[in-house]
């Protein structure tokens, strides 16, 4: 069949163009090392691949959150460990201070040391993270949470905000403990009230004062603090307790009063050890929680009062209350440290799980996406040879004419 010159050029150009196009299409796969780049390469595999990549991306986000939450909880746990160590020193020195052989100068020296401990815990409570934010200020990370006042009291300037991060599907972890819950919400060792002893000639002690019946606890009709007056109206040597509220309204009279035996009024249960004297008066002020700073301040005030206490018996009673609260504060700090430790255990568990899951996902992704280099290179070389052969054939045929046969 006779082939025109134009047809010859067209057919050969088309052949080389197709082979060149085939070669060019293979280049991106080789350069990227991927078998599937777009949906048109393999629509089914591309869909599966998208699922794998989304899951891997989500784990990467979880892992970023894990790093952040781990850093914060490690810092929190360390802060509580330092605080607990300091509180143990506070307890040790306060026990040493209860020695009649000590002079006022000795007690003042211990009080000065207590002030150093207060400063140390305050520094811990005002700790910052790696980005410069206060870790115990709640959501007010730019606001110093605790401020020392001239009288050694401490005020909280943060809020109660708690932040969480997602570290797994439906798994969230706290990354902070606000300062009020960390250092101020320590349960009162006596219960829900703190006693003050207006007169305590008999040397009795309030050992327990709790709201044991919330339904009967009426703070509108009978607001706290509650005054307990010890009387003997019958002059029979048997004490009664006249209970009045903050407005001096009478609530009830406990008759007879029995030392060590609990009595109740307005939903409140009270136990008093020892025998009060007629005319003694105690006041129960509502105080469910006591901050760690209040406790250390109380210890400092007790020490600085020294031998000048008007009532040495009452001074010893106050000592017992303060020591009990020091013990309660130390235990509370240990529990808060434990909460940070539990968070770290959860974080580490999720981190390990993500490592296993990510390995499985990467294997699945690789089986779909990654290129078989040996096969791809072989195919590329074959296509390259085919193109070269077509080019050489065209070049040789292009140089032929009728004169070559004469």
PLM features: what roles do these ranges have?
Residues 1-151, 173, 301-406:
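Amphipathic alpha-helical polymerization modules
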Residues 144-311:
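Cysteine-poor, low-complexity segments in flexible/peripheral regions
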């Amino acid at each position: 069949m006779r082939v025109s010159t134009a047809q010859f050029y067209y057919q050969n150009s088309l052949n080389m163009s197709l082979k060149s196009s085939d070669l060019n299409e293979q280049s991106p796969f080789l350069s990227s090392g991927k078998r599937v780049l777009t949906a048109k390469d393999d629509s089914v595999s591309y869909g599966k691949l998208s699922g794998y990549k989304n899951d891997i991306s989500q784990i990467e986000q979880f892992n970023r959150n894990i790093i952040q939450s781990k850093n914060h909880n490690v810092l929190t746990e360390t802060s509580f460990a330092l605080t607990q160590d300091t509180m143990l020193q506070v307890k040790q020195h306060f026990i040493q201070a209860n020695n009649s052989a000590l002079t006022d100068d000795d007690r003042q020296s211990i009080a000065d040391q207590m002030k150093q401990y207060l400063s140390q815990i305050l520094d811990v409570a005002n700790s910052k993270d790696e980005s410069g934010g206060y870790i115990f200020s709640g959501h007010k990370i730019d606001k110093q949470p605790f401020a020392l006042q001239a009288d050694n009291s401490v005020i909280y300037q943060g809020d109660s905000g708690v932040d969480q991060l997602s570290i797994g599907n439906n798994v969230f972890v706290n990354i902070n403990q606000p300062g009020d819950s960390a250092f101020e919400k320590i349960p009162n060792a006596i219960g829900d009230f703190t006693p003050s002893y207006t007169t305590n000639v008999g040397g009795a002690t309030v050992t327990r004062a709790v709201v044991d019946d919330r339904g009967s606890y009426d703070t509108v009709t009978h607001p706290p603090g509650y005054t307990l007056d010890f009387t003997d109206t019958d002059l029979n040597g048997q004490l009664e307790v006249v209970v009045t509220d903050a407005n001096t309204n009478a609530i009830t009279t406990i008759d007879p009063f029995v030392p060590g035996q609990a009595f109740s009024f307005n939903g409140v249960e009270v136990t008093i050890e020892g025998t009060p004297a007629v005319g003694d008066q105690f006041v129960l002020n509502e105080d469910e929680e006591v901050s760690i700073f209040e406790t250390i301040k109380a210890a400092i005030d007790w020490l600085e009062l020294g031998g000048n206490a008007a009532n040495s018996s009452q001074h010893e009673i106050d000592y017992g209350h303060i020591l009990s609260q020091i013990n309660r504060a130390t235990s509370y700090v240990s529990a808060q440290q434990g909460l940070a430790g539990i968070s770290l255990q959860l974080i580490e568990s999720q981190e390990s799980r993500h490592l296993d899951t990510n390995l499985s996902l990467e294997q699945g992704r690789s089986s779909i996406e990654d290129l078989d280099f040996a096969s791809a290179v072989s195919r590329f070389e074959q296509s390259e040879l085919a193109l070269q052969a077509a080019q050489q054939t065209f070049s040789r045929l292009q140089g032929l004419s009728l004169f070559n046969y004469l």
